[in-house]
Amino acid sequence: MLPKLNDYNDLLVKLDYEMKQLNESDNIYDLLNCLLTLNSLPEWIKNSKTASEELKKIALEKEKIMKGENGFSLDEKLLFDDINHQLRFVRLVCNHTKHKTDSKQIPIIESI
């Protein structure tokens, strides 16, 4: 039986599974899986039939931050302390995996 991904709650279950995998493996592929799932959460919430209007509003605001709209830009100094900068970082990493560019705005992740 395949798991179903019908709404954002199912996506949260998927993220929980991926986080456990990451904690066990400490693997870059598992990290990327987590980031890709995190990247899609605001859109899933925004389009959900079960999410409250308040949650949808928050998701829309976070999605705009992630996309760099309204002049929001990533400040690496705030990355560990500010959720908005963390979300922007997630979006940049995910877009870089889909659309390889030489942009200086795309973070470089190196495995150690």
Sequence positions of predicted segments:
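Amphipathic alpha-helical protein-interaction segments enriched in hydrophobic
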Residues: 32-39
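Extended, well-ordered alpha-helical segments in internal regulatory regions
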Residues: 39-52, 100
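Acidic, Ser/Thr/Gly/Pro-rich intrinsically disordered interaction regions
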Residues: 1-32, 53-112
